[in-house]
């Protein structure tokens, strides 16, 4: 069993908890196989892994050629499955993806040939389908999902109900924020690849949204966020913020991170007097440091360069 796997994949480095080669490894716990991490391997069958089905908890395949996934469904104790940058001669596995009763995390990423995912699961909490060509979530039936990552693909709306979803990573360009009505418990939103004419209409319907971060957005002030009354943490680092205009409309905002923006300085404490923490280059707040100290507002200046 294990000896055959060692020989087939040239796993010649043996220690107390790992059997490995330069690119792949098997992790042991109490002499039982619990994790497989394979990189750039040709895996013609999952039959080699079936003897460990009762103990195998985690699998990571990176840049592997996976010829036959039909036996994957027999790994019923699997909790974490990562298929990153892998090739699949038979793509039909994604038309009816196996249901693992114990699976908590599923990552299928960095393969633009994947256009569909048909899956049903009551156990998965985290799903990452970034860098694929999946266009919709109509066939993703995961009612207990708490985190969804969909960056660098073609998903422009949430067309499935995810009542427990709390964390979402999504491309903002052309995204329909009104579709987030399907995620009533969304608390953390991470936005990437914003458009030059980016709008946030519809996002105000996410009444429980507490955390928002944006990367490379076109916004020069805080007016686009003015309807997001529930926000407590806003991260706009490395954006185009030139002024604090609009910040007064965010009454519950506690933390503001804004390193590396073109804003030259803050000379008036009024817009941020309700904050608990501001992260900004020190030279931009020199005029108000005494006021910040008086109000007990912490300032983080690690971004000073």
Residue ranges and their predicted role:
Residues 1-19:
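Surface-exposed cap/linker segments adjacent to membranes
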Residues 16-18, 35-44, 58-67, 77-90, ...:
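Concave beta-strand-loop units of leucine-rich repeat
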Residues 21, 25-40, 52:
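Acidic, low-complexity, intrinsically disordered interaction modules
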Residues 26, 200-201:
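Periodic aromatic/glycine/histidine/acidic cluster detector
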Residues 46-55:
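Extended Gly/Ser/Thr-rich low-complexity repeat segments
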Residues 48-49, 71, 93-96, 179, ...:
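A short acidic, amphipathic alpha-helical/loop segment
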Residues 72, 117-120, 140, 158-161, ...:
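Tandem-repeat architecture and repeat-register "anchor" residues
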């Amino acid at each position: 069993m294990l000896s055959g796997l060692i020989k087939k994949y040239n796993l010649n480095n043996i220690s107390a908890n790992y059997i490995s080669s330069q690119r792949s490894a098997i992790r042991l716990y109490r002499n039982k196989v619990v994790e497989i991490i394979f990189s750039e391997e040709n895996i013609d069958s999952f039959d080699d892994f079936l003897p460990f089905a009762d103990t195998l908890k985690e699998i990571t395949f990176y840049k592997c050629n996976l010829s036959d996934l039909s036996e994957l469904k027999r790994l019923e104790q699997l909790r974490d499955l990562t298929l990153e940058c892998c090739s699949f001669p038979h793509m039909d596995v994604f038309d009816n993806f196996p249901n693992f009763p114990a699976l908590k995390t599923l990552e299928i990423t960095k393969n633009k040939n994947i256009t569909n995912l048909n899956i049903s699961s009551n156990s998965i909490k985290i799903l990452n389908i970034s860098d694929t060509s999946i266009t919709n979530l109509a066939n993703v039936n995961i009612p207990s999902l708490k985190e969804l990552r969909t960056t660098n693909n073609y998903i422009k709306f949430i067309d499935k109900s995810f009542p427990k979803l709390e964390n979402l990573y999504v491309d903002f360009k052309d995204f329909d924020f009104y579709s987030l009505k399907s995620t009533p418990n969304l608390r953390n939103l991470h936005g990437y690849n914003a458009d030059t004419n980016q709008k946030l209409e519809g996002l105000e319907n996410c009444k429980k949204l507490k955390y928002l971060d944006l990367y490379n957005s076109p916004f020069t002030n805080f007016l686009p966020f003015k309807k997001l009354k529930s926000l407590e943490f806003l991260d706009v680092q490395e954006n185009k913020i030139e002024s604090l205009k609009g910040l007064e409309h965010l009454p519950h905002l506690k933390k503001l991170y804004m390193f590396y923006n073109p804003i030259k300085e803050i000379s008036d404490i009024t817009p941020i007097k309700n904050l608990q923490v501001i992260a900004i280059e020190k030279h931009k707040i020199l005029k108000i440091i005494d006021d910040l100290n008086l109000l007990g507002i912490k300032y983080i200046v690690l971004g000073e360069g």
